[in-house]
Amino acid sequence: MRLVSVIKRPVAQLLLTVLLFCGIAADAQENSPYSRYGWGNLVPSTPIATRGMGGIGIGYVDYDPRYDFKFQYPKSQTVNFLNPASYSRLKITSFDLGFDVENQILRERNVTEKYKATYANVSYIQLGVPLSRKRNIAMVFGLRPISRINYNIRNYTRELNPVTGNSIDSTLTIYEGTGGSYQAYGGLGKAFGKLSLGLNGGYFFGTKDFSTKKNFINDSVLYYKGNYQTKINFGGLFLQTGAQFSTKIGSSTRLVLGATASFKKDFNAKKNLVRETFEYDGSGGIVTKDSVYEEKDVAGKVTFPGTYGAGFTIEKEERWMIGADYTIGNWDDFRVYGQKDSVASNWKLKVGGQFVPNAFGANYWGRVTYRLGFNYGPDYIRYNNEELKQYTVSLGFGLPVRPARFSNQYSNINLGFEFGRRGNNNTALKENLFRLS
């Protein structure tokens, strides 16, 4: 869900803050084996206003008729961080908070059981401020997650005697991981007539804490358990650039072309390694028996790839919009301390549109924005060297809180409903995801 308004409502701000912390607290329920690879599952990188349109956004600027009755240039009240060039059209101070509620269903091939989980996460929090409406300059500040790591995998096996081949003991191996990555950013957009240019810059940081715990199961012999744990932290400055070109293609129809680029970057990192034997205490906590090996603050690099995209929208004044994006990510360049992971370069196609029956009509549902879209493309993660086909279909609504023509305190609640699938019946794991934003 998304709320945007002029910031003059302390009660609403308090409510949104509470929702922010509730979303963070609920994150612990997520469990995705896919997030073991790369730097985890990528979070949707679009504002909720466009998620209902398949996640388009590179050529997106919403039209606000309060500031442009001649439809000469787009005038926006949506903070579209996907393309910072769109900031230049921002005409009101906007506070924007997005959060998701997700339902995950994970099924393993040839296994009837399935894993289910429901959890909530914060999508982003940002503030957009027009610096000069006349000169079309605006800036944005925000914080958003880029990826999430949450998994807990248990594997039971039988150990065999290497000489006789007979079964000796059972073992339980637990693979666990937490972490993710985030961007704290500031952005600036400036329009030069039909051309808008923009950039986002700030601090990109993250952590990955993963371990393998091995437990021999034997009723008569006591074995210490083994823990192999690694924690990596990285951080550094990043830069994203964007451009949009807007032109009329009819008396009340506009075309916007857009492009974005984020370049390959090496980030400084620190790594801690622990190899130890342990036992569990009465409350399930770990009690170290012997530290076999330990190494702290090992310096290195984490390399994130360049990502590039192009897109367009065509909009009929106060009526409809259609658009598409195409993006590529050079994930073959991804490295952690020089090591390649189970990832590969990927692409994604997004298509969507929206329709407003009567933007200034008396009927409320006529002023609602209705959205529909889909996206398709392989995930950047490879599971058992298998390409994970991925698609999402989406439906969205823009719910006006007040009629725009009667108030400068224009609030809008955007809802997005998405159904996504990663993998299929031929891959080792298939994941279905239902998301309410």
Regions of interest found by a model, annotated:
Residues I24-A28:
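Sec/Tat signal peptide C-region and signal peptidase I cleavage site
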Residues R9, G23, K296-V298:
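Short, flexible coil/linker elements and helix-boundary hinge sites characteristic
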Residues A12-G23:
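Bacterial N-terminal signal peptides
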Residues Q29-S437:
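Subset of outer-membrane beta-barrel
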Residues M1-K8:
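N-terminal secretory signal peptides that target proteins for export/translocation
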